[in-house]
């Protein structure tokens, strides 16, 4: 008897550990710097994006991080910066037929129940492949505020005017577009090249503010920007989430006692990005370290790093940046006939503080290399979820939906409800709804993700009518822009 009880207990533990989460960020980066859209024209680019979004929706993705400013330019209509060459093939040239990719992507994502996070590269002013800059580009109008490094042009982080300029660009995006997030990646000070120094001597003399160590000064510059960026976004629209996706190693243990047991380039020491300072001070709403290596990598082991980030970066929601191609290229060390997707996903489930995943890059999942996308849609992301909790932004929630009523229509048996009375500000407004189902005798518990059947912007849900003999209770809650959830509204039905 004891043996049987032990088996049942272990089975319950196993099932609990792999239970579907109620909240999870399931993101994908759609980049333009790989040239996938450059010069292909409006119709072809829209067709490409529609296909990618449709496939990602099937995979269970609930957030798109879309690159809109790769080199102080714009994949949206801007009065501040020129149109991107990654859109039209020539910087400063508007798309023809005219369209606004950012506005279009917002509409496409929202219609699919996805968030849209606008992704900018804050300091990079010119990539290596750009040979011609528009006359209104910042590197043309203010070359003294930039420096060249290994074929790149960089807005000098040591010049205060550049912080203000980037925040002006961001504020323009936030004010004019209904984005759900503002996202920056790992490009702060440039990735170092042996024998090549960053040319910022004069700025160090002018703007050191009493900081005598060059590295400390550079970190201070970037931290000032990150703080200002966060405050700029939330002063304009508090619900817009600010996310940062740093390089995957904060520091190596040989450089700092709190570092990871790795041997690679470091955010803190080479990119001058003090990620933990920003997280612990609340200057971002989510962090996505790019842990692009495989399990077993000698210099930067994936398992070592995901444990490190889970332990040290829990003050804000933590999502893991996954390299799809590298994941399927490398064999599972414990099961060499399979690649590493399942092994990595187990780590996501087992470790505390992991609240989601972002796929690098979207097209790799869409192309379904190694059946990566198939596994997402069939096994890992096959249930609806809410976005991770961010009550540190605001704890308030809307009131509950009203007047739940099942009605026979020409389209079937539909559960309708009425939106709650709107409050005075954004936090009290219903943005979308969560729908739960409970069989007769089941305890009503909306914390149990197994009962979540839909997340929708509609005020109705089609019921799966069968014989009309089975009794269920449907529960609907209202969600605001950051998915804070109302009290439940209930309705008993027979299906």
How should these model regions be labeled?
Residues 463-486:
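Beta-strand-rich modules
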Residues 161-169, 175-184, 188-291, 296-315, ...:
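Active-site neighborhood of glycoside hydrolase catalytic domains
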Residues 74-89, 124-150, 186-209, 253-265:
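Aromatic- and acidic-residue-enriched segments that line the glycan-binding/catalytic groove
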Residues 371-427, 483-495:
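Pro/Thr/Ser/Gly-rich low-complexity, intrinsically disordered linker/stalk tracts
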Residues 47-74, 176-179, 277, 283:
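Catalytic domains of carbohydrate-active enzymes, especially glycoside hydrolases
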Residues 272-276, 280-298, 314-392:
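Substrate-binding cleft of secreted/luminal carbohydrate-active enzymes
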Residues 23, 31, 35-47, 118, ...:
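Active-site-adjacent "subsite" loops/lids of carbohydrate-active enzymes
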Residues 60-96:
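Aromatic-lined carbohydrate-binding/catalytic grooves of carbohydrate-active enzymes
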